């Protein structure tokens, strides 16, 4: 028996030593006298695969499996070669057959799970197979490793952490097990434990560069900023290309890769907690944010922090400093494109947006595009997002004279496309919101560039000439980098809504019939502790009242219920509505008695939704544009008495309207009447106001004058807006 197995053993030893060519020659010689030895054919397949001959390896594995169908390793080798050769369907079919034939082989189940995931993206099927494999072999390393990676990709952080702990218990000397545990804990926000796990992984071996990056993230989240910088430097010294690749993987679409800035990383991580209305560490978060704005090397340049800042109690000048840092960083990385002067015919106006899709921006803007005066204006729309098949996307496409989808080209190509249209004015509807591509604007594809609607605040950019605002929206003109173009009455517009679900009932939403319903349909990013505290004061003062919230993409209501209980308000008085189609969303608003606004980042389109449904909106006008949007809308609608100046006044007004039924009903009647009188709801009127603004901006540009503050609502002469030179 020993003599018979000698060629097998020698061939296996040669393969283990990396001597595939010698193994192949030995096996071919042996097969000449033993042509039906399945094990020899299997080993020859392995040798041919190692030598880079997958077709020949496939034939050898197939022959081995034919000779001995129970030789699982040979049949698995055949599947592997089918994958290498790109014959995925055949590989999947054969792998599935192996699962049927060998249901008790854990490794085989794990192999099929990985193939199913890689070839078909079937995450649920892969997880089920790995669960079966681990039921048979609880410590099976490939199953634990790949199952954990998938759970992390799916965002199932708790399950990923549990899987990683099992992995560590089964393989305590395996660095990848500890690294995976660290990554799962990092994703869960357990930063101390994550750091310990990563350090254990690194103690078992030097680890890849990205493990040092993850260590830097954990240190940054723990506010150990100097140590985080050292970890990032170590990662770059190991593999700078891998680190840059990781940064690029974090970029959304065409956005620039984020810097490995420890303070910015901490702020971004902590902001995720703020999004869940978890304010347990808010004071430290705000302290780091403010300190970062005045550090010696300048504020952070991450644009996401600009969006986050709208919901934070920063001063207008602090927001300007952050915006300047971001815009200067953007401008430094690009070159302007060449452009030809606009023609002498109709004004050519472009609208640039990341939200020409099923999004509120498209809902607001497409009627405006249709309403522009085509005798004087030609309208271009540039989409930074791919088509989603929605009616709103189609409506934008129909409303523009020319629609360009630039989502699949790089920034420079997009800027050149825009420049080729020889615009007079390019209006940016995104600002620093998700999906925006500020680099395009920094390349100056249009002679006049303006910011409007999507980002309530300064962009701090030399490449943005004007912000389209109104006199209510701007409380601190000195804290803007752009010149102001003051639109008459209000900066906003809201097209009338006709599709509204009729006669919805409170019991459909779990609302008490006899209670006063205080609506607060805000995304949790807009809810701040001061506003929530004011809402709780109103609830305490009006015992038969409930606060009606709305579902979001983060689980925030449990945090608010805990905050409510701490304020002496029963948690069950906070109710939540699920997501629904737009007609039902509008219809259910009519079930509310009052709408309570947030303080730092007002409701704007949602406030208009409430007003359209006859629900009074109580707001507080702050010192920043994001905290004055609702005041602008209410003032323009003849409802300025719903605007308050202090938190105490906000509470007092809400309580008075809640308690005084005749006053509340009278206010609701005024709100309903405003639908026919408010300029906010007059799309044609808003189009004329914007056209007046466009004419004024272009007139200065064509005369070679720099941008200057323009009041499009106060005419200096017939058809000429007043200009502050």
PLM regions: where:
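A short structural motif in glycosyltransferase catalytic domains
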Residues: 598-600
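Catalytic cores of eukaryotic secretory-pathway lumenal/extracellular enzymes that build
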Residues: 574, 579-580
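Short hydrophobic "strand-cap" motifs at the C-terminus of beta-strands
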Residues: 352, 521-522, 550, 577
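Short acidic/histidine- and often glycine-rich active-site loop of Leloir-type glycosyltransferases
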Residues: 627-638, 643
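Short alpha-helix at the nucleotide-sugar/activated-sugar donor binding site of glycosyltransferases
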Residues: 610-612, 635
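Glycosyltransferase donor-sugar binding loop
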Residues: 383-388, 546-559
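Alpha-helical solenoid repeat scaffolds of the TPR/TPR-like class and their adjacent stem/linker regions
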Residues: 1-511, 523, 533, 562-569, ...
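Short glycine/serine-rich donor-binding loops of glycosyltransferases
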Residues: 606-607, 630
């Amino acid at each position: 028996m020993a003599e018979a197995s000698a060629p097998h053993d020698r061939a296996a030893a040669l393969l283990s030593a990396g001597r595939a060519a010698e193994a192949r020659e030995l096996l071919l010689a042996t097969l000449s006298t033993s042509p039906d030895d399945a094990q020899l054919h299997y080993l020859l397949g392995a040798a041919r695969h190692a030598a880079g001959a997958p077709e020949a390896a496939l034939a050898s594995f197939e022959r081995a499996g034919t000779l001995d169908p129970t030789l699982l390793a040979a049949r698995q080798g055949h599947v592997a070669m089918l994958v290498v050769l790109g014959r995925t369907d055949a590989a999947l079919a054969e792998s599935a057959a192996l699962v049927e034939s060998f249901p008790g082989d854990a490794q085989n189940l794990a192999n099929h799970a990985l193939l199913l995931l890689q070839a078909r993206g079937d995450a649920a099927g892969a997880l089920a197979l790995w669960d079966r494999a681990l039921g048979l072999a609880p410590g099976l390393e490939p199953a634990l490793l790949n199952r954990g990676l998938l759970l992390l990709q799916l965002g199932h952080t708790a399950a990923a952490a549990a899987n990683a702990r099992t992995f560590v218990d089964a393989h305590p000397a395996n660095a990848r097990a500890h690294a995976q545990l660290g990554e799962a804990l990092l994703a869960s926000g357990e930063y101390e434990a994550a750091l310990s796990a990563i350090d254990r992984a690194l103690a078992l071996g030097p680890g890849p560069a990205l493990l040092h990056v993850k260590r830097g993230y954990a240190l940054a989240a723990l506010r150990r900023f100097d140590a985080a910088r050292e970890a990032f430097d170590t990662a770059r010294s190991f593999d700078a290309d891998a680190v840059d690749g990781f940064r690029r993987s974090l970029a959304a679409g065409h956005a620039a890769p984020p810097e490995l800035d420890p303070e910015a990383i901490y702020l971004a991580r902590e902001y995720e907690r703020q999004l869940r209305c978890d304010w347990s560490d808010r004071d430290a978060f705000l302290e780091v944010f403010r300190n970062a704005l005045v550090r010696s090397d300048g504020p952070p340049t991450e644009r996401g922090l600009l969006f986050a800042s709208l919901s934070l109690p920063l001063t207008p000048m602090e927001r300007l400093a952050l915006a300047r840092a971001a815009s200067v960083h953007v401008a430094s990385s690009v070159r302007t494109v060449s452009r030809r002067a606009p023609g002498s015919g109709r004004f050519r106006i472009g609208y640039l947006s990341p939200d020409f899709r099923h999004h509120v921006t498209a809902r607001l803007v497409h009627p405006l595009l249709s309403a522009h005066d085509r005798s004087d204006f030609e309208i271009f729309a540039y989409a930074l997002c791919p088509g989603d098949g929605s009616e709103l996307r189609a409506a934008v496409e129909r409303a523009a004279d020319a629609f360009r989808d630039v989502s699949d080209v790089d920034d420079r190509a997009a800027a050149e496309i825009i420049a080729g249209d020889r615009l007079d004015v390019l209006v940016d509807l995104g600002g620093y919101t998700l999906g925006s591509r500020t680099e395009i604007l920094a390349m100056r594809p249009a002679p006049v560039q303006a910011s409007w609607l999507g980002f309530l605040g300064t962009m701090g950019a030399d490449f943005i000439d004007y912000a389209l605002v109104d006199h209510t929206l701007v409380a601190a003109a000195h804290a803007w980098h752009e010149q102001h173009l003051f639109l008459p009455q209000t900066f906003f517009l809201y097209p009338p809504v006709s599709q509204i679900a009729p006669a919805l009932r409170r019991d459909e939403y779990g609302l008490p019939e006899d209670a006063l319903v205080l609506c607060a349909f805000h995304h949790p990013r807009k809810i701040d502790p001061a506003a929530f505290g004011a809402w709780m004061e109103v609830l305490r003062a009006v015992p038969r009242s409930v606060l009606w919230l709305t579902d979001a993409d983060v689980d925030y209501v449990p945090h608010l219920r805990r905050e409510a209980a701490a304020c002496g308000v029963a948690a069950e008085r906070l109710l939540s509505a699920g997501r629904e189609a737009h007609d039902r969303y509008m219809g259910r608003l009519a079930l509310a008695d009052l709408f309570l606004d947030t303080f730092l980042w007002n409701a704007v389109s949602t406030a208009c939704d409430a007003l359209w449904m006859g629900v009074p909106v109580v707001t507080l006008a702050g010192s920043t544009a994001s905290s004055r949007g609702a005041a602008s809308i209410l003032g323009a609608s003849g409802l300025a008495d719903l605007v308050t100046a202090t938190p105490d006044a906000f509470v007092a007004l809400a309580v008075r309207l809640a308690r005084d039924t005749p006053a509340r009903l009278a206010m609701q009647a005024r709100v309903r009447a405003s639908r026919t009188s408010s300029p906010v709801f007059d799309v044609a009127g808003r189009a004329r106001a914007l056209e007046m603004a466009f004419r004024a901006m272009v007139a200065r540009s064509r005369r070679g004058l720099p941008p200057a503050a323009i009041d499009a609502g106060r005419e200096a002469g017939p058809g000429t807006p007043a200009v502050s030179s």
